[in-house]
């Protein structure tokens, strides 16, 4: 066991997670069609503050993230402060770590708390796959810059004459890795082939995710942590996530064709997480500040770890790399955990990480560790379903997982929970949470 790194302030305070909330998650171009991520962020932070009745001046910092950024509002965090009635002097900045963005936001606020520069802050993220920054071609962009500098009409017309019809076509945001050109689904296909993960196994995990999520909603387990969203023209509120397939069967999954490797692939739209809109946020405080305000924390942040690996092959192995570090820093092992919540970007990616967490060979030959991190107990794993069912607004998923895990730990009488995710760029994140 390596060095334990307690997350406490100089006064010995633990980092308390006081409350968490999210919007319902909606599939692309459905309930939140036309609602920018900034508005979703304002929606959830405003409601979170209203529910907790925490005075606005108590919050000293807001760290928020957005993966698909809009050029007109590059600092979503500051826009949320200005758009929710928070104190205008509240420090606010934005972060981006792809699918682990709100993990990063939480870590940043925690570091400010430990440094003693603040005593309370908000962390979270929002993304919209329905409101996108549609760009222009590189050639058109260059011509427009040159036209802006041209002095005469003839010079401008000459510049425009260089363009062809194809140069005028809109350019949607890239869905591939900038450095490799590989799509996330291509990487999931790599992982399925590398680790021998079958189509049947992937479909079974996806089906399990939807069943567990549907059950969680039907039993009322998510009611406290998901707000009702009222969307223009305000005819019908959105109360629940709209991606969950409660009545599907395994046979339904088998009907879909591969989405990336059309001839030999096993990754489909059904065993992958969909493009989604939504926002989520959590309030963090020092333990003593929470007591001063008479607040009972949901739980505490025990440890966290971020890792990075090469992007060319099987890059979505973040959980297999970051989990042992987070456990080590928490002074725990896999067997000490009550719950394990892993982001399901793809069923193939999820199953590959589960396999490697229990692999002695991977631990020895790749991580340089004496023993495997530990087998994943199915009874502890994604007990309320995961991202395949709920959806994945990139920057919001981490805050969803943290809030959901802490609520479930409290229902079970407390314990330790692991939340972990892969992210684009070969990045990984893991956090250990504690509830009493």
From Swiss-Prot:
GO terms for cellular component: cytosol. One of its GO terms (molecular function) is acetyl-CoA C-acyltransferase activity. It catalyses: an acyl-CoA + acetyl-CoA = a 3-oxoacyl-CoA + CoA. GO terms for biological process: fatty acid beta-oxidation. Its EC number is 2.3.1.16. InterPro entries: Ac-CoA_C-AcTrfase_FadI, Thiolase, Thiolase-like, Thiolase_acyl_enz_int_AS, Thiolase_AS, Thiolase_C, Thiolase_CS, Thiolase_N. It is an enzyme of class 2 (transferase). Signal peptide: none annotated. Its main location: cytoplasm. Keywords: Acyltransferase, Cytoplasm, Fatty acid metabolism, Lipid degradation, Lipid metabolism, Transferase. It comes from the Bacteria. It is found in: Cytoplasm. The keyword Calcium does not apply. Gene3D superfamilies: 3.40.47.10. Pathway: Lipid metabolism; fatty acid beta-oxidation. The active site is at residues 99, 392, 422. Heterotetramer of two alpha chains (FadJ) and two beta chains (FadI). Catalyzes the final step of fatty acid oxidation in which acetyl-CoA is released and the CoA ester of a fatty acid two carbons shorter is formed. NCBIfam families: AcCoA-C-Actrans, FadI, PRK08963.1. Belongs to the thiolase-like superfamily. Thiolase family. This is 3-ketoacyl-CoA thiolase. The lineage of its organism: Bacteria, Pseudomonadati, Pseudomonadota, Gammaproteobacteria, Enterobacterales. The gene is fadI.
């Amino acid at each position: 066991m390596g060095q334990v790194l307690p997350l406490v302030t100089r006064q010995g305070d633990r980092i308390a997670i006081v409350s968490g909330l999210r919007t319902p998650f909606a599939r692309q171009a459905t309930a939140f069609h036309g609602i920018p991520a900034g508005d979703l962020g304002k929606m959830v932070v405003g409601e979170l503050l209203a529910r907790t009745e925490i005075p606005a001046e108590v919050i000293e910092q807001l760290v928020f993230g957005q993966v698909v950024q809009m050029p007109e509002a590059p600092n979503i965090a500051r826009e949320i402060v200005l758009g929710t009635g928070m104190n205008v002097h509240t420090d606010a900045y934005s972060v981006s770590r792809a699918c682990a963005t709100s993990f990063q936001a939480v870590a940043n606020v925690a570091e400010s708390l430990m440094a003693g520069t603040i005593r309370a802050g908000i962390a979270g993220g929002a993304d919209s796959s329905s409101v996108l920054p549609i760009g222009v071609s590189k050639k058109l962009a260059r011509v427009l810059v040159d036209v802006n500098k041209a002095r005469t009409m003839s010079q401008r017309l000459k510049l425009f004459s260089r363009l062809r019809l194809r140069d005028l076509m809109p350019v949607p945001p890239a869905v591939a890795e900038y450095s490799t050109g590989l799509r996330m689904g291509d990487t999931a296909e790599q992982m399925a082939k590398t680790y021998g993960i079958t189509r049947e196994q992937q479909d079974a995990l996806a089906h399990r995710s939807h069943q567990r999520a549907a059950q969680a909603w039907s039993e009322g387990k998510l009611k406290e942590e998901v707000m009702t969203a009222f969307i223009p023209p305000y005819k019908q509120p959105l109360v629940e996530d709209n991606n969950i397939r409660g009545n599907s069967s395994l046979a339904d999954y088998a009907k879909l064709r591969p989405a990336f490797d059309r001839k030999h692939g096993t990754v489909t739209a059904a065993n992958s997480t969909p493009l989604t809109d939504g926002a989520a946020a959590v309030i963090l405080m020092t333990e003593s500040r929470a007591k001063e305000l008479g607040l009972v924390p949901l739980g505490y942040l025990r440890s966290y770890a971020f890792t990075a690996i090469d992007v060319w092959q099987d890059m979505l192995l973040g959980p297999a790399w970051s989990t042992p570090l987070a456990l080590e820093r928490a002074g725990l092992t896999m067997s000490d955990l009550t719950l394990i919540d892993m982001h399901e970007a793809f069923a193939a990616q999820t199953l590959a990480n589960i396999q490697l967490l229990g692999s002695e060979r991977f631990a020895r030959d790749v991580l340089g560790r004496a023993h495997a991190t530990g087998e994943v107990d199915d009874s502890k794993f994604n007990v309320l379903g995961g991202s395949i069912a709920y959806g994945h607004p990139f920057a919001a998923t981490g805050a969803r997982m943290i809030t959901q895990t802490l609520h479930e730990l409290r229902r079970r009488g407390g314990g330790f929970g692991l939340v972990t995710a892969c992210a684009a760029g070969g990045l990984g994140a893991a956090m250990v949470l504690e509830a009493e």
